[in-house]
């Protein structure tokens, strides 16, 4: 008889979940982004702006529906999936009805918004279908089970939205596609999870679950507002087409970090809470991986904003160029704070994470209103650089890691500075807004990536090569 196969080590399960997470994000987001690129040529900016306003409202509503429970599930040893399913289903239906009734309240942002919102509100309950199976697979570090459903959802949304936009449906092409995608994803995810997820309904647990997830709920709510409130501030001062320009520029700036975000980081940090060395190392490697790709994208967009907008959105979207120039480096600072938040959640430091996000929200609203009233949407973009909560997060990360923070700070400095000479040379050698600079910048990004890969290949191999 052969020797029994060794169970995969924690590091190997993390690697598999990480690769699966990247596969999901890459396929779904590239397909979705390609669809938006196509629709940019089929739907006017006003339609994009109207959709973004409605999307932000239902997304924040979905955070209210969840009450932070899906995130608490990852760290609750009782695995109360059935109780959370009952809660999200009931609240999803209730909030959907509330949005339908209260839709006229949002008419001040755009006269057509209430009608769109009444239909789009159904997304809140449909999206809630997938909450429990998604949390289950993430907790068990088996995210690969979600590859099929997530990729299928992306293709359905892309095909349906482009097809309906081509038929002249305008903003409704976005809405119909999102509703169909949410329904498909929920049904398929449950087909993978059914029989594996314990669904015992224990309603007496609900008050305790809500209490323990309260900080996570408020964190998630504030995070949603920090992420999406730009659109509403711009909507107050500008026309809906400007909202569309800003939203698409934001989407380009954040495309890379959304794809390469380490989705398995939170459950991995929970796994290593008692192993300080590996806890630090996994946080450090996740930071290097995410910000390493992002800084290359930021430099590329900074030196090639005009051509990037032309290729991705078309010539009618030229007003998005100055917005993209301002937004290009926002993800580099934003994503470090998000990674720090994952670490604080794993350490149950929910209050500290909430304080940081509230400070960021206050800064964003305050500076955003002042800057937007003076300089329009570009001022709102600039306000994202004035978030003092990011400094608080840097201090908290330093306080947790102390002497090891020097290593992390050196990594951040290297990531930020190493690509600069490559891109600066391309910018110096070729004129702005030229195809030669665009091509040279691609070469610069490839060379900088190769140097960074050589620098960090050894620590990545050392971490993920560990066996049980």
Task: Show the residue positions of the predicted features.
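Membrane-interface junctions at transmembrane-helix termini in multi-pass inner-membrane proteins
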Residues: 71-80, 126-150, 172, 193, ...
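Helix-loop junctions and terminal segments of transmembrane helices
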Residues: 62-81, 138-139, 249, 253-294, ...
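Transmembrane helical elements of multi-pass membrane transporters/channels
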Residues: 17-32, 153, 174-185, 189, ...
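Signature of the first transmembrane helix
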Residues: 10-67, 96, 100, 104, ...
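Hydrophobic alpha-helical transmembrane segments
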Residues: 115-121, 147-195, 211-212, 219, ...
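Alpha-helical transmembrane segments of multi-pass membrane transport and lipid-handling proteins
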Residues: 86-119, 159, 163, 261, ...
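Membrane-proximal transmembrane or re-entrant/amphipathic helices at the cytosolic face
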Residues: 1-7, 425-468
């Amino acid at each position: 008889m052969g020797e029994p196969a060794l169970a995969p080590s924690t590091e190997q399960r993390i690697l598999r979940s990480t690769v699966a997470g990247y596969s999901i994000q890459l396929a779904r987001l590239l397909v979705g982004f390609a669809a938006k690129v196509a629709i940019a040529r089929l739907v006017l900016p006003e339609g994009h702006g109207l959709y973004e306003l409605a999307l932000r409202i239902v997304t924040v509503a979905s955070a209210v529906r969840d009450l932070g429970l899906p995130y608490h599930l990852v760290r609750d040893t009782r695995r109360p999936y059935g109780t959370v399913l009952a809660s999200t289903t009931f609240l999803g239906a209730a909030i959907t009805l509330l949005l339908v009734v209260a839709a006229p309240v949002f008419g001040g942002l755009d006269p057509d918004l209430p009608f769109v919102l009444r239909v789009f509100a159904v997304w809140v309950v449909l999206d809630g279908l997938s909450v429990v199976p998604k949390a289950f697979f993430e907790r068990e570090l088996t995210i690969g089970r979600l590859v099929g459903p997530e990729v299928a959802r992306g293709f359905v949304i892309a095909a349906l939205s482009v097809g309906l936009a081509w038929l002249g449906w305008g903003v409704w092409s976005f809405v119909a596609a999102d509703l169909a995608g949410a329904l498909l994803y929920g049904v398929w995810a449950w087909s993978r999870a059914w029989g594996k997820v314990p669904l015992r309904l224990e309603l007496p647990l609900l008050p305790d679950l809500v209490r323990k997830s309260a900080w996570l709920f408020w964190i998630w709510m504030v995070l949603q507002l920090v992420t999406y409130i730009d659109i509403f501030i711009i909507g107050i001062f500008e026309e809906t087409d400007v909202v569309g320009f800003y939203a698409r520029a934001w989407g380009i700036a954040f495309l890379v970090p959304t794809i390469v975000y380490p989705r398995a980081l939170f459950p991995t940090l929970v796994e290593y809470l008692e192993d300080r060395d590996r806890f630090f190392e996994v946080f450090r490697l996740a930071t290097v991986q995410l910000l390493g790709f992002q800084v290359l994208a930021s430099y590329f967009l900074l030196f090639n904003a005009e051509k990037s907008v032309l290729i991705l959105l078309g010539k009618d979207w030229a007003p998005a160029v100055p917005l993209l120039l301002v937004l290009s480096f926002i993800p580099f600072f934003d994503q470090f704070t998000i990674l720090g938040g994952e670490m604080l959640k794993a350490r149950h430091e929910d209050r500290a994470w909430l304080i940081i996000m509230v400070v960021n929200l206050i800064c964003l609203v305050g500076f955003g209103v002042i800057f937007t009233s003076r300089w329009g949407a570009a001022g709102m973009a600039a306000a994202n650089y004035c978030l003092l909560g990011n400094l608080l997060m840097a201090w908290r990360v330093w306080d947790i890691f102390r002497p090891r923070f020097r290593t992390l700070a050196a990594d951040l400095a290297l990531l930020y500075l190493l690509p600069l000479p490559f891109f600066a040379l391309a910018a110096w050698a070729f004129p702005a807004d030229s195809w030669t600079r665009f091509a040279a910048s691609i070469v610069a990004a490839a060379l900088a990536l190769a140097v960074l890969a050589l620098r960090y290949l050894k620590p990545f191999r050392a971490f993920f090569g560990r066996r049980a």
